[in-house]
């Protein structure tokens, strides 16, 4: 019969083995996949670009030109690690040309108005960036069978502030 400490050690060992297997599965899944990331120069987009690059994915990013030296995209030196195109996802013709030529099998869509205070100052522009950019991606990709997945990533700012410290659930307002 196992003692408490032996059982705990055994569980930790099993979890480490499962974690290692999962990491291998994820790395193998993304290796050599052609992946398009919109919003690649933003905080989340830069991290995603970095990790997919380390997994040997073929990554192309779309984003705004970073204008600050403390920008994560610049700090990670991603311009030398992934392909990058600087344009707005509202520019449907450029987006279509890129998708048609690069032929991504997976698209991570992160492009959005990143600054909340700017969204209050420029609500129409924010809606155009967030909604029309997403519509362009979805509309264009319905024509291409090589696109297998589109993952739209947002933030907690899509939820009404409920002043809770518990975080949000999918069915929150």
Which ranges hold each PLM region?
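N-terminal Rossmann-like NAD(P)+-binding domain of SDR-like oxidoreductases, especially those catalyzing
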Residues: 1-173
